[in-house]
UniProtKB/Swiss-Prot annotation:
Lineage: Eukaryota, Metazoa, Chordata, Craniata, Vertebrata
UniProt protein name: Estrogen receptor
Predominant subcellular localization, coarse grouping: nucleus
Annotated domain remarks: Composed of three domains: a modulating N-terminal domain, a DNA-binding domain and a C-terminal ligand-binding domain.
Subunit structure: Binds DNA as a homodimer. Can form a heterodimer with ER-beta.
Gene3D superfamilies from the UniProt entry: Erythroid Transcription Factor GATA-1, subunit A, Retinoid X Receptor
Chain segments carrying region Modulating: 1-138
Annotated region (Hinge), positions in chain: 205-266
GO cellular component, one term: nucleus
Location(s), subcellular: Nucleus
Region (Disordered): 210-264, 511-585
Stretches annotated zinc finger (NR C4-type): 139-159, 175-199
UniProt keyword annotation of DNA-binding present: yes
């Protein structure tokens, strides 16, 4: 305890203690304490109840400094002696005055001068705040401050370095969620897959800084224009690096000729970047099945995953450069002819780094032994694993994979007769042009691998020859899936069912009439046409009773009905039935 003594005018010492009761001695024989701990903050006696104060017993802190040893309790009102209504005791002038009013307190009330800091918020919301950020650039990926114009867009040092690392060599980023993670300044490191996807979406490209394409001159010209443009043009300036990418991926409202000219002017390296940016995410089955798997559980898991992947496959196809410029008929025909091949090459690509296993989803990894519980599945598993092993030996690059995947889709128009519709492409020249563009991009990538000309040609042939094996596996898988459908062992979802029926529907009347005229000679088709669908194999005979009439009574599919979302039932139907199981001869 540290007492502090002071002499009043009457010569009586007043002692203030840091602990215990606080006694203010009066000039009486027996000084009485005015308050204690129990009455602190709740004593409300009037000021004149104890008589006038002596001059030395208590003084206002406004008239002189207090000792640093005096303990000041935190209660707002100690007693009428400490806080009389007319004045604030134990308060220095530097302490802010707290009032119950909601109006802001000007600093003139306390210090006599106005504090300039109170107007910072007002200036920040006005013209002064804009002047501070007028020349500030933000990263197009994470919205952090941009350090420069990197890879075709304004970006920060972190996103620039991340994109540089990602485009060098093989990367297998996988999103742990739904490939829709938020990428900003604070969460840009949480998901590499979504960060790389956003880099492609905002227009980052590998050749964005190449001088031989004149990009440096265009960038300098753009910077010069930015300094002369008013503030209202700043959002357009930040989006300008994406103009070329938007023109290449224009919507279906653009005419076919415009889309074709944009493909002609698109360099191969940009085509590769667009193909990589269009890749769908790796999905999760989100179904918990106990092991060991049975035939029903495995087929349920696989058909459910296939239906989910079909939705993402349609989104992927729409992102291919020039695909939306095709007619709706051609888009549907290409997807119907190649959907299982596209899913299979994606499965093979995911399984390259895991020998002996097939990665259907992040939480659905099967080996060859687990596929033996399904009749006929082990053979398909063996072919998939063999193709994955071949790609592993060739050290398939991501750029080569996206090119092969797009080639499968576009080249399927030449085999559209497999769907049974016998309808040719409306604009086969546009499809062939897209196919040539992507093939050129594949050749461009192989030419930059540092191999000799002979090795480049050999590698290109080796990659393209593997596509025939994938088509063979697709046919096997289609047969197996269709047999599962006819046995009614597993439920098939709408989109998967429609895609499957597109390969198994009866052939329309007009193609058989053209065959009878000698345009297309096929003994099997002629016998089938003459028999009216009743002379097929056992499977066709078993389903003849479920048909609503002879084969000639079936109508050709109406493609105009496909303008709605592909997930609805009845996209490709004959008399609204999905029960036709007739095998195509």
């Amino acid at each position: 305890m540290y007492p502090e003594e002071s002499r009043g005018s009457g010569g009586v010492a007043t002692v203030d203690f840091l602990e215990g009761t606080y006694d203010y001695a009066a000039p009486t024989p027996a000084p009485t304490p005015l308050y204690s701990h129990s009455t602190t903050g709740c004593y409300s006696a009037p000021l004149d109840a104890h008589g006038p104060l002596s001059d030395g017993s208590l003084q206002s802190l406004g008239s002189g400094p207090t000792s640093p040893l005096v303990f000041v309790p935190s209660s707002p009102r100690l007693s009428p002696f400490m806080h009389p209504p007319s004045h604030h005791y134990l308060e220095t002038t530097s302490t802010p005055v707290y009032r119950s009013s909601h109006q802001p307190v000007p600093r003139e009330d306390q210090c006599g001068t106005r504090d300039e800091a109170y107007s910072v918020g007002e200036l920040g919301a006005g013209a002064g705040g804009f002047e501070m950020t007028k020349d500030t650039r933000f990263c197009a990926v994470c919205s952090d401050y941009a350090s420069g114009y990197h890879y075709g867009v304004w970006s920060c040092e972190g996103c620039k370095a991340f994109f540089k690392r990602s485009i060098q060599g093989h990367n297998d980023y996988m999103c742990p969620a739904t490939n829709q993670c938020t990428i900003d300044k604070n969460r840009r490191k949480s998901c590499q897959a979504c960060r790389l996807r956003k880099c492609y979406e905002v227009g980052m490209m590998k050749g964005g800084m190449r001088k031989d394409r004149g990009r440096v001159l265009r960038r300098e010209k753009r910077r010069a224009c930015d300094r002369d443009k008013p503030a209202k043009d700043l959002p357009h300036t930040r989006a300008s690096p994406q103009d070329g990418r938007k023109r290449a991926m224009s919507s279906s409202s653009t005419s076919g000729g415009g889309g074709r000219s944009s493909l002609n002017n698109m360099p191969p390296d940009q085509v590769l970047l667009l193909l990589q940016g269009a890749e769908p995410p790796i999905l999760s089955s989100r179904q918990k099945m106990s092991r060991p798997y049975t035939e029903v559980t495995i087929m349920t898991l696989l058909t459910s995953m296939a239906d989910k992947e079909l939705v993402h496959m349609i989104t992927w196809a729409k992102k291919l450069p020039g695909f939306l410029q095709l007619s709706l008929h051609d888009q549907v025909l290409l997807l119907e002819s190649s959907w299982l091949e596209v899913l299979m090459i994606g499965l093979i690509w995911r399984s390259i780094q895991c020998p002996g296993k097939l990665i259907f989803a992040q939480d659905l990894i099967l080996d060859r032994n687990e596929g033996t519980c399904v009749e006929g599945m082990a053979e398909i598993f063996d072919m998939l694993l063999a193709t994955a092993s071949r790609f592993r030996v060739l050290k398939l690059k991501p750029e080569e994979f996206v090119c092969l995947k797009a080639i499968i889709l576009l080249n399927s128009g030449a085999f559209s007769f497999c769907t049974g519709t016998m309808e040719p492409l409306h604009d086969s020249a546009a499809v062939q042009h897209m196919l040539d563009t992507i093939t050129d991009a594949l050749i461009f990538h192989i030419s930059h691998l540092g191999c000799s000309a002979q090795q480049q040609s050999r590698r290109q042939a080796q990659l393209l020859l593997l596509l025939s094996h994938i088509r063979h596996m697709s046919n096997k898988g289609m047969e197996h899936l269709y047999s599962m459908k006819c046995k009614n062992k597993v439920p098939l979802y709408d989109l998967l069912l429609e895609m499957l029926d597109a390969h198994r529907i009866h052939r329309p009347v007009k193609p058989f009439q053209s065959w009878s005229q000698g345009d297309r000679d096929s003994p099997t088709a002629s016998s089938t046409s003459s028999s009216g669908g009743g002379g097929g194999d056992d499977e066709g005979a078993s389903s003849a009773g479920s048909s609503s009439g002879p084969q000639g009574s079936h109508e050709s599919p109406r493609r105009e009905n496909l303008s709605r979302a592909p997930t609805g039932p009845g996209v490709l139907q004959y008399r609204g039935s999905h029960s036709d199981c007739t095998r195509i001869p």
